[in-house]
Amino acid sequence: MGNKVIAMKSGRFIGVMSGTSLDGIDVVLAAIDERMVAQQASYCHPMPLQLKKDILGMCQGQSTTLSAVGKLESQLGILFAEAVLALLAKAGLTAQDITAIGCHGQTVWHEPLGEPAFTMQLGDNNRIAAMTKIATVGDFRRRDMAYGGQGAPLVPAFHHALLAHSTERRMVLNIGGIANLSMLLPDLPVRGFDTGPGNMLMDAWIWRNRSLPYDKDNEMDAPTFTASECLNVSVKTQKKERPHESIYSWYRLGKKCFPASWCRLQRSNCS
């Protein structure tokens, strides 16, 4: 991501996000006044188990049909709208109180190294707008790619708006399903890129081996290896498997870059 950051419009906005962890639909109500952002309410809407399985199957490249893709697009649009309506009820507000909804959509495929590069998010924004009666914007990733970005414009832009400094060099690490880094350097455009898997692989391992959605409060026994040791092994493995690629090209990542088989390999290497 390297596009110019523009000033934010004042008003109340709702953000809708469903990441690669698939642990729920996060919705946040924020009042924005130029560079000031005040969170006013938040809510996590549950993700139905069957829908989660359908999304995971698509992300892992299982065979599908156009009918299944279209159905999932509509189902997610309805689910996102229901999450927004639940947040409004919790906050005691109506559609007239909200300037706009920003909906990222659910990523099912992300291929920034493709020729041409592309990314795909599902979740019908038209359905969200119709059900909530609120203007809805989205499709952020594809626009970023069209301008030469890696398809992840939102987090770096947000970090820049809130944390950029006129003289200090700052970097912000955001750990989601895939971890990413924002570089905030004085007098230079904001830059952002992926650094590798975040909680996505941990969640996948816990689900596969303990039938739990995630490791709540780190209740599982502590590992016998350190994070740095495992990282070193992972980098060495990647260099061996992809000798002709620069390590910097690994920054442009998607969930398909780290399937369950990759997770098992890294765990066995670190044991």
Swiss-Prot record:
Alphabetical list of InterPro entries matching this protein: Anhydro_N_Ac-Mur_kinase, ATPase_NBD
One Pfam match: AnmK
GO molecular function: ATP binding; phosphotransferase activity, alcohol group as acceptor
Protein's GO biological process: amino sugar metabolic process; peptidoglycan turnover
UniProt cross-references to Gene3D superfamilies, sorted A to Z: 3.30.420.40
Family: Belongs to the anhydro-N-acetylmuramic acid kinase family.
Protein name: Uncharacterized anhydro-N-acetylmuramic acid kinase-like protein
Organism whose genome encodes this protein: Yersinia enterocolitica
